A protein has these predicted regions:
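Beta-strand-loop-alpha-helix segment that lines the small-molecule cofactor/substrate pocket
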Residues: 66-67, 73-74, 78-125, 140
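Conserved SAM-binding strand-loop segment of SAM-dependent methyltransferases
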Residues: 49-56
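N-terminal Rossmann-like dinucleotide-binding module
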Residues: 1-48, 367, 381-386
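Contiguous beta-strand/loop segments that form the cofactor/metal-binding neighborhood of enzyme cores
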Residues: 184-271, 300-312, 329-332, 347-386
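Glycine- and charged-residue-rich phosphate/anionic-cofactor binding loop of Rossmann-like
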Residues: 28-31, 286-290, 307-324
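Predominantly a Rossmann-like dinucleotide-binding segment in NAD(P)-dependent oxidoreductases
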Residues: 124-220, 339
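Active-site loop of classical SDR/Rossmann-like NAD(P)-dependent oxidoreductases
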Residues: 36, 292-302
């Protein structure tokens, strides 16, 4: 079989994770990488045995690339996605989809018109941990979901990231850097969100680069680094969330309370067991349910997109899901600024869990209609947008 050709735009830190994992999936093949920093792209290409494209335009012009993986900074997401779409490529984007709803809608509309598909990170929702939790919910492990509690606290990435400035700029901070993992998981497990209310603060006007050649450099903080959020779902479920880069203590939690118990979801990565509490915790009735599927890593969303294209179906980590998550996060930002609740206009289509035996390391046989790269159907782009 012929693996789907992939081109990567952006050779920053996150590209290592994609290049490592995509090399282990036989259904896809990284052909080339490009970056505005030509030397950085060349170094990554040499390290992982792929080609370095001289420019992004050169990468987009290649006939052996069907999917473009957009790993640029958030401010460049829309421009790179639109250029890839104009070149007839499908797009897998890092989170967030874009920085605003107008550009996000422009990306999805352009893809719809061009007959290509946009899918978007985070692909942790395709990891065996969250997939296992979704199957348990659908099987009624905790009864009817009623409330949600999520928590993400830590000191922030400025201590370890060699170039953390963009993580404290518009389109980042804890809400847009870490929030997509939580918000996308909320939507995956509990359905569309209809309203949010938030409060935020920015305790420090400046941060300091903690590692690398720029260690000691001060830089401005452009976004709130602590947010407390209330969320209402279309189903009636109500959630409480904290997103913070201002705590020396590192804590992560994602708990769904149902009519018959509590589900602890491993939201921070691709694996880990789901914990289920049946009844009252005084009975010490917690049990761990290990995921049945094969291990998955960063880049599994690119693989699932490639298989979806060959099957002629929408990808699970779809553009409409990313659009809905983006609107939710922008609404959180607006509510924190205005002090009033904000309604969410978009929705998201239901996402079916992957089959328990779905294996990223397996070589699958493409359908006969996909030999040259099939186009997924239009609902992959339009579903969920109002």
């Amino acid at each position: 079989m012929t693996a789907t050709g992939v081109g990567i735009v952006g050779a920053g830190n996150i590209s290592d994770e994609y290049l490592r994992s995509l090399a282990t999936y036989p259904d896809v093949r990284v052909v080339a990488i490009a970056d505005l920093d030509v030397e950085r792209a060349a170094a990554q290409a040499d390290r992982y045995g792929v080609e370095a494209a001289p420019t992004v335009a050169d990468l987009l012009a290649r006939d052996d690339i069907e999917i473009v993986v957009n790993l640029t900074i958030p401010a460049a997401h829309a421009d790179v996605a639109l250029a890839a779409i104009a070149a007839g490529k499908h797009v897998w984007g890092e989170k967030p989809l874009t920085l605003d709803l107008a550009s996000a809608r422009a990306v999805l509309d352009a893809a719809q018109e061009a007959g290509v598909v946009v899918a978007n990170a985070p692909d942790t929702i395709l990891g065996e941990g969250i997939q296992n939790a979704q199957r348990l919910l659908l099987d009624g492990a905790v009864g009817e979901p009623r409330t949600l509690l999520t928590l993400m606290q830590g000191p922030g990435p400025d201590a370890w990231h060699p170039r953390p400035q963009f993580l404290f700029a518009r389109g980042a901070g804890p809400l847009f850097d870490i929030g997509p993992y939580y918000v996308s998981t909320m939507i995956q497990l509990l359905g569309p969100i209809v309203q949010v209310e938030a409060m935020g603060q920015r305790p420090r006007a400046e941060r300091v680069v903690g590692s690398g050649p720029d260690a000691g450099l001060r830089f401005p903080v452009e976004v709130d680094t602590h947010l407390s959020v209330l969320t209402r779902f279309a189903s009636g479920v109500v959630g409480t969330s904290v997103y913070s880069f201002d705590s020396p203590r590192r804590r992560q939690a994602f708990e769904i309370t149902g009519s018959e118990g509590v589900l602890e979801v491993p939201v921070s990565g691709f694996d880990g067991p789901t914990r289920v509490l049946a009844g009252d915790d005084r009975d010490h009735a917690w049990s761990e349910v290990a995921p049945p599927g094969a291990h998955r890593e960063r880049g599994v969303g690119v693989l699932e997109l490639a298989r979806a294209l060959r099957d002629g179906r929408p990808p699970r980590a779809s553009g409409p899901l990313a659009f809905h998550a983006l609107e939710v996060m922008l609404a959180v930002e607006e509510s924190a600024r205005s002090g009033v609740p904000v309604a969410i206009d978009s929705t998201a289509p239901p996402v079916e869990p992957l089959p328990p035996d779905w294996d990223p390391s397996a070589a699958t046989t493409p359908s006969s209609s996909a030999a040259t790269g099939s186009r997924a159907t239009s609902p992959a782009q339009s579903g969920g947008l109002r």
